Every structure is written in structure tokens, then in C-alpha cells.
């Protein structure tokens, strides 16, 4: 093995864009549940600096009106500039209190929770904004 020193840096611009999209995924998940119903669950996602793709379960195509309502809900939460609260708690306590977890995901005994006021509360280990106002305008470009 080579013992040469290495230097690593965080690309702040890349991190910020990815962080904005990641928190947006949480907001979109809850907006989908509010508009389409509590049966909606996340089935996958792609979060990168340029785009957010959110895969979810639902039994029919989402209408243009529903997409507009989802977009409006997310943008309202962004405009409200709600602080993001991140904390750790025992897994079973989180589940018992109704915090959203991904089905089939493996979690440890202690989990990290991302809470955005009373709007969204999910288990998550990713990077998030300090307050929703940092995200900027949210747009839905397509639904397939």
C-alpha cells in the first residue's frame, strides 16, 4: 500500500444543490401522501445536484391538477422557511411514534430522524437544509 498523504475537500456547491434536492424529496413525499392518500410510499429515488426523481406507489396516473397541488404544498412549506430538526432516537420508539421509515430498509437500534415541523418526520441519514427556505422554488417537470 502507498502511504502517500491525500487531501480531500467537499465541493460546497455540489453538496448544497444535492442537499436542497434531498430535503425536497422529503417534502414531496409528504405532499404526495396529503394529495393522493396515506397509501403512498417511497419506492426509490434519485437525488443529485441537478435533479430529483421520486418513485412512489400509487394505483393510477397522477392528474395535472394533483401535480399542481403537490407542487403548491411543497412551495408553501419552502416559503414558510421551516427549520429542520435532526435528532437520534431508538428505532422502536421512532416506529411506535409513527415516524415514516422505508419498508424493507435495515435500521440500527438508534436511528436519525429528520423532522420538518409537523409537516414531515422521516428516518434519514442524508444531508438536509437548516430551513426549508434555503431550497428555492420547487417544480414538477413530469410524472410517468
Predicted feature residues:
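A glycine- and charged-residue-rich anion-binding loop/surface
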Residues: 1-144
Amino acid at each position: 500500500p502507498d502511504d502517500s498523504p491525500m487531501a480531500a475537500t467537499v465541493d460546497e456547491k455540489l453538496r448544497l444543490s444535492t442537499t436542497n434536492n434531498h430535503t425536497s424529496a422529503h417534502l414531496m413525499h409528504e405532499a404526495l401522501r396529503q394529495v393522493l392518500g396515506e397509501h403512498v410510499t417511497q419506492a426509490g429515488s434519485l437525488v443529485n445536484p441537478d435533479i430529483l426523481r421520486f418513485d412512489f406507489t400509487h394505483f393510477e396516473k397522477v392528474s395535472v391538477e394533483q401535480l399542481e397541488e403537490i407542487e403548491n404544498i411543497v412551495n408553501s412549506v419552502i416559503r414558510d422557511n421551516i427549520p429542520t430538526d435532526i435528532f437520534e432516537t431508538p428505532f422502536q420508539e421512532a416506529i411506535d411514534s409513527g415516524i415514516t421509515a422505508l419498508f424493507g430498509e435495515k435500521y440500527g437500534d438508534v436511528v436519525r430522524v429528520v423532522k420538518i415541523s409537523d409537516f414531515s418526520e422521516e428516518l434519514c441519514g442524508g444531508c438536509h437544509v437548516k430551513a426549508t427556505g434555503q431550497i428555492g422554488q420547487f417544480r414538477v417537470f413530469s410524472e410517468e
